[in-house]
Design a protein with these regions (language model features):
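Short beta-strand scaffold segments in enzyme catalytic cores
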Residues: 30, 37-42
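Nucleotide/phosphate-binding catalytic cleft detector across ATP-hydrolyzing
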Residues: 1-29, 44-195
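Gly/Ser/Thr-rich loops at beta-strand to alpha-helix junctions
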Residues: 35-37, 128
Length: 195
């Protein structure tokens, strides 16, 4: 991976990226619209390069309602235009259309850094509000994470299992050489009849 701290990358981000890299032309950018909005970049050599993390759509709207005294809580929806004619419409446009513009602009910057066009795949619970407003060509796949988990499960299941030199785990008592003692059934004792 082409990142500074591979262990710190969110597993959901890696799963999204793994599925996209296996099923779409490279380079590929995945965008997951949830509590946070995350961008994940896989280059033409299948190297996970990192990405972008910013506040999610609903997180930003909720923060405006909580932190700004004059602004209400707004329910998510699709804005009809960029220019809002009241406070709620302005907030909706800024959040939903603003996220679409963020995606378009960020993918353009990513493509410039990669030096080539990228495939864009969008997923997440809030993507349905945003994807119709994006101008960059994209694929919307609401099941990207589930498909990624299924893919990784299949890949892991198809790998040969490696066992210890002794052929796996041994249960029961071990002899002085560390090998499991073979269990044998006790010998039947027969009663001798007197002669």
């Amino acid at each position: 991976m082409g990142v500074d701290e591979p262990h710190a990358v969110g597993k959901d981000r890696l799963v999204d990226a793994a599925y996209a890299a296996a099923n779409f032309p490279l380079p590929v950018v995945t965008v997951d619209l949830g509590t946070a909005t995350t961008f994940n970049v896989v280059d033409e050599n299948r190297v996970f390069r990192g990405g972008v993390i910013c506040p999610g759509l609903s997180t930003g709207l909720r923060a405006l309602g909580d932190r700004c005294a004059q602004l209400p809580q707004v329910h998510l929806g699709s804005p009809k235009s960029a220019i809002g004619t009241n406070t709620e419409k302005c907030m909706l446009s800024g959040s939903v259309m603003g996220t679409a513009v963020l995606i378009d602009g960020m993918v353009q910057r990513i493509e410039e850094e990669l030096g080539r066009p990228a495939t864009l795949v969008v997923t997440g619970g809030l993507a349905k509000y945003v994807t119709p407003l994006c101008r960059h060509p994209l694929t919307y796949d609401p099941e990207l994470l589930m498909k990624g988990l299924a893919l990784l499960y299949q890949l892991n299941a198809s790998q040969p299992q490696h066992h210890s030199a002794g052929g796996g785990r041994h249960y029961g008592r071990q002899n002085q050489h560390g090998h499991a003692k073979q269990r044998t059934s006790p010998k039947k004792r027969t009663r001798r009849e007197p002669e």
